[in-house]
């Protein structure tokens, strides 16, 4: 598999000023992204806490987004839900991801073989968001579904993504991770560096108890042939069922084969 033996560099850089960056637009998009899987209604106070913005700023943003159709105001609760314009964007994005349809049967094969959960994800800022999910019917799996978000720096899926992107993009992402938690950053950085070593050694990235102490996973990222953003596929589940040895020895070759089959299928289309 291409590029699986070259260890990506990991560097640190300071924050960058960008005169082309539109702060008001970024805040509006950040507010929309505060709605998580399972959220039905959120008020200005909840949104302000999640976005870490003043409530007055959030009030102006929700007013504008409601006028534009990206939020819908619920008069009974005084809160907001995502509007039809937002849902239309999501629908268009998912409809373009033909990889989901191609991946489903292959992901199910791996899930059944390993009695685990196999998920396909893409990056959204400092998270990976599940866009497809397949579970084994014969084993306990994690309670995550399409739309679930997991952190980029502590999960196998996120680390696999970091391993294949450009050095400049990786540096920018990790700088934002550092800004979120200066105290834990040295530990996070060391874990990411170790994950890049895993990528060079095994051709995949790992997270054995790093995200959650009772969860083990491996993952591999790849660039779709159609030029869209990189995607990651993980294979994971409860640590008592999926040992690191099993995942690396038994599941890893099948995960690598899955990605190769996806590439070949998409290139032939």
Regions found by a protein language model. Name each.
Residues 2-101, 260-268:
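N-terminal helix-turn-helix
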Residues 172, 178, 256-269:
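Cysteine/selenocysteine-centered motifs that mediate thiol-based redox chemistry or coordinate metal-sulfur cofactors
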Residues 2-11, 139-211:
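Short, solvent-exposed recognition segments
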Residues 71-73, 120-121, 222:
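A structural signal for short hydrophobic beta-strand segments in well-ordered beta-sheet cores
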Residues 38, 114, 124, 200, ...:
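Residues at helix C-cap/C′ positions in short coil/turn segments immediately following an alpha-helix
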Residues 185-261:
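Extended hydrophobic
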């Amino acid at each position: 598999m291409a590029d699986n033996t070259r260890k990506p560099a990991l560097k640190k850089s300071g924050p960058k000023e960008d005169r082309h960056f539109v702060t008001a637009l970024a805040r509006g998009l950040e507010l929309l992204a505060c709605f998580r899987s399972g959220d039905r209604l959120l008020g200005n106070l909840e949104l302000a806490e999640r976005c870490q913005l003043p409530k007055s700023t959030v009030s102006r943003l929700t007013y504008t987004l409601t006028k534009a159709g990206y939020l819908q105001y619920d008069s009974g609760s005084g809160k907001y839900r995502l509007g039809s314009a937002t849902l239309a964007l999501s629908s268009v994005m998912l409809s373009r991801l033909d990889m989901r349809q191609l991946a489903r049967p292959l992901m199910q094969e791996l899930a059944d073989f390993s009695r685990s959960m196999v998920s396909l994800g893409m990056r959204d800022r400092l998270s990976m968001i599940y866009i497809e999910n397949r579970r084994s019917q014969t084993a306990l799996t994690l309670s995550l579904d399409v739309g679930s978000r997991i952190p980029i720096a502590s999960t196998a899926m996120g680390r696999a993504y970091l391993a294949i992107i450009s050095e400049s993009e990786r540096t920018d992402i990790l700088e934002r991770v550092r800004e979120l938690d200066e105290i834990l950053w040295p530990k996070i950085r060391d874990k990411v560096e170790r994950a890049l070593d895993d990528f060079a050694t095994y051709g995949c990235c790992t997270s054995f108890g790093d995200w959650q102490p009772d969860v083990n996973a491996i993952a591999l990222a790849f660039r779709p042939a159609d030029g869209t953003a990189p995607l990651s596929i993980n294979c994971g589940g409860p640590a008592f069922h999926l040992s690191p040895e099993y995942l690396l020895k038994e599941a890893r070759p099948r995960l690598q084969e899955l990605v190769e089959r996806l590439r070949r299928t998409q290139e032939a289309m």
